[in-house]
Amino acid sequence: MIAVTIIDWLFVLALLLPVLYLFLFAAFSMPRSKDVYPPARKQRRTVTLIPAYKADAVIIRTAQAALAQEYPAELHRVVVIADQLKPETLGELRKLPLTVIEVTFENSSKAKALTAAVDRLGPDAAEIVTILDADNLVDGSFAVRINEVFDAGIVAVQAHRTAKNRDSDTAVLDAASEEINNSIFRRGHVALGLSSALILSLIHISEPTRL
């Protein structure tokens, strides 16, 4: 009987710990204090890396949004890491004021694409490195605001990603899941002094060697 009771309590504890974990961070994510950073004293050199694996349908729009920044063009470089893009897509990209790095791998991955780009660009390519997915869209003030954050002494940032489309039940569910994850695993973590969980896109770091 005692052995059964201990097993029961261990089972309850195993179920309770994840619930308490989620509840704790969800509770601390509720206060919505808005971080406001002062204007940056220095404009840093930035590079935006966009790994694009067979992303012909979305990469042009993403690249255009990444370029359309309220930030000095000479300090803001956009690099598309093209993995198996169509020739016509590559042609359209090369018409834009950005760098195209073509890569080919037996087994493609974002990590391999980013490593190849960093090796090609070198460690002194920029002071701020931004990683976007091929379908991430950013607004025109994005680079300015990220520079303000780094000017405050922060060396790594996970930006807030939101769903683009909410025109179907599945899209709404995906958007809700994104916001729940952002609240619990990012806002909640930061509120308790922990690092934000990473989502491998919209990440900003202070130099390429940190990749």
Residue ranges and their predicted role:
Residues 60, 86-94, 141:
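Acidic helix N-cap motif at the loop->helix transition within catalytic regions
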Residues 1-42, 93:
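N-terminal membrane-anchoring/stem segments of glycan-assembly enzymes
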Residues 64-75:
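Short, acidic, metal-binding catalytic loop of nucleotide-sugar glycosyltransferases
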Residues 45-47, 77:
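Cell-envelope/extracellular polymer assembly enzymes that use nucleotide-activated donors
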Residues 31-32, 69-71, 139:
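Catalytic cores of nucleotide-enabled group-transfer and carboxylate-activating enzymes in metabolic
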Residues 102-123, 140, 145-206, 210:
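Long helical/loop segments within the catalytic core of UDP-sugar-dependent glycosyltransferases
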Residues 79-90, 104-107, 137:
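A conserved acidic beta->alpha catalytic loop
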Residues 125-137:
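Short beta-strand-to-loop acidic/aromatic patch adjacent to the donor-nucleotide binding site
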